[in-house]
From Swiss-Prot:
Compartments where located: Cell membrane
Name under which the protein is recorded: Membrane-associated protein TcaA
Gene: tcaA
ZnF C4-type: positions: 4-21
Keywords from the UniProt entry: Antibiotic resistance, Cell membrane, Membrane, Metal-binding, Transmembrane, Transmembrane helix, Zinc, Zinc-finger
Residues in the Extracellular compartment per record: 71-460
Organism the protein comes from: Staphylococcus aureus (strain MW2)
One GO term describing the cellular component: plasma membrane
Entry function: Plays a major role in decreasing resistance to glycopeptide antibiotics.
Family: Belongs to the TcaA family.
């Protein structure tokens, strides 16, 4: 379409004269317009052909940009840089995330210890250099899949390994810290409570039994902890150092506010050693001068006493109280028996025992002669007066005499004797008919007018 320059009437391009005013149209203008339209159409065709190429080129640029972005964050070198930056900047949370595995959760405090251990035992500059070299060699190698970074003393501190690929192009590097098991060996059953892997943990260890408390990455640890024993509750620390271990375990040193008690007894020379006891906080234990008792909490008073026997009588010291303010890691205390009282009692009992032994010597001298006469004459009446009638021993000896199986005895010696009411227990050493020395234990009963009679006997 075109318009008349004189009246503005619209007309077709091929019309030569305006139907409104009769004005004659310029034919050159029509030809120019036609030529222009053809040029535009040609240019449009060219542009449509260029669009796919432009889109393809744009996509290629995007791919190249994306590749470099991925490379910056996912190449082995980039993965290495992330770990290095975290260690350099003491980013314990990032290090904990990088080192945590499905089987071993590393918390931020453990990561903090690990960072310090690397800086102390390897040196940051050396660690970075070793790590980059290790990653480079693994990345180039077709056969190697893992390698270790070590401390100056030769201990493994970081395992670097290939773990598949990232986005097809890049090796995925895995960084894992090797672990060891800290072990405790308490003297008595102990419960330990502490934080590990970001969670509260409880470990119960039996007395004198090696017990692991978990898995830890390299470091020098001082872990706040509580422990509980039969003696009480303690606050303190569990300490262990990977530098002090060349095995899969590391010994734990306990650092708690505790007191250990060493006891010295005085005035106890007349007491039977095996009878001596120490009672601490109402808990009775065997006494030993070389033994250390405890540990006990340093924030509570301790009560302590001792006891022992002499001639079957129990003697006790006064109970002492050790104030909490006086308790130290090693606390010594002396407990005193009334030695004069003990000696007087022992002297009295020894006189009684000597009197009893004399009676028994006389009794068994007569009994051995009567026993042998009964054997020789096959007559129970010789020995019957020495044995209580109605006792099982009475019937047994009578039966043996009748069967001729009664054994002859000689040279009786009183080894030991004790009296409890009207009953007497005596250990007698004899020589039997075979000439062998034997010890026999007899039980006797003391009747009216101090008459002694046998009730039973047994081999010692």
């Amino acid at each position: 379409m075109k318009s008349c320059s004189k009246c503005g009437q619209q007309a077709q391009d091929d019309v030569q004269i305006c139907t409104q005013c009769g004005h004659k149209f310029d034919s050159r203008q029509a030809l120019y317009r036609k030529s222009t339209d053809e040029d535009i159409q040609t240019n449009n065709i060219k542009m449509r052909k260029m669009v796919p190429w432009a889109i393809g080129f744009f996509i290629l640029i995007l791919i190249i940009i994306l590749f470099f972005l991925l490379r910056n964050f996912n190449s082995p070198e980039a993965q290495t840089k992330i770990l290095v930056n975290a260690i350099e900047n003491n980013d314990k949370q990032k290090v904990a995330t990088l080192l945590s595995t499905k089987d071993n959760k590393v918390d931020s405090e453990e990561a903090k210890v690990y960072i310090n251990y690397i800086k102390d035992e390897v040196g940051l500059k050396q660690f970075v250099s070793d790590l980059k070299n290790t990653v480079h060699k693994l990345n180039k190698s077709k056969t190697s899949v893992a390698s270790y970074i070590q401390t100056r003393s030769g201990q493994n501190i970081l395992r670097v390994s290939k773990n598949g690929t990232r986005y097809i192009f890049f090796d995925n590097m895995s960084f894992t810290a090797p672990t060891k098991q800290p072990i405790v060996k308490p003297k008595e059953k102990t419960k330990y409570e502490f934080k590990s892997g970001g969670k509260k943990k409880t470990v119960i260890a039996e007395a004198n039994k090696v017990t692991p408390i978990g898995n830890f990455i390299p470091g020098t640890y001082r872990i706040p902890a509580m422990k509980s024993t039969e003696n009480g509750d303690f606050a303190g620390y569990l300490k262990f150092d990977f530098r002090q271990s060349n095995s899969e375990t590391v010994d734990v040193t306990e650092d708690f506010e505790e007191a250990n008690i060493t006891v010295t007894l005085k005035g106890d020379t007349k007491l039977n050693d095996s009878s001596k006891k120490v009672t601490i906080n109402d808990r009775e234990m065997a006494f030993s001068s070389s033994k250390t008792y405890g540990p006990y909490p340093q924030n509570k008073d301790i009560t302590i006493s001792a006891s022992g026997k002499a001639k079957d009588k129990t003697f006790t010291t006064q109970t002492k109280t050790i104030k909490a303010s006086d308790l130290k890691y090693n606390t010594e205390i002396t407990l005193n028996f009334d030695s004069e009282d003990i000696e007087d009692y022992v002297e009295k009992k020894e006189k009684e025992e000597n009197s009893l032994k004399n009676k028994l010597i006389e009794f068994f001298a007569g009994y051995s002669l009567a026993n042998n006469a009964a054997f020789n004459q096959s007559d129970f009446d010789f020995v019957s007066s020495y044995i209580k009638k109605g006792s099982s021993f009475y019937d047994d000896v009578k039966k043996r005499v009748s069967k001729g199986s009664l054994m002859m005895i000689s040279s009786p010696q009183i080894i030991d004797a004790e009296k409890h009411g009207d009953k007497i227990t005596a250990t007698v050493r004899l020589i039997n008919e075979n000439g062998k020395q034997v010890d026999k234990e007899y039980e006797l009963e003391q009747g009216s007018q101090d008459r002694l009679q046998l009730i039973k006997t047994s081999e010692k």
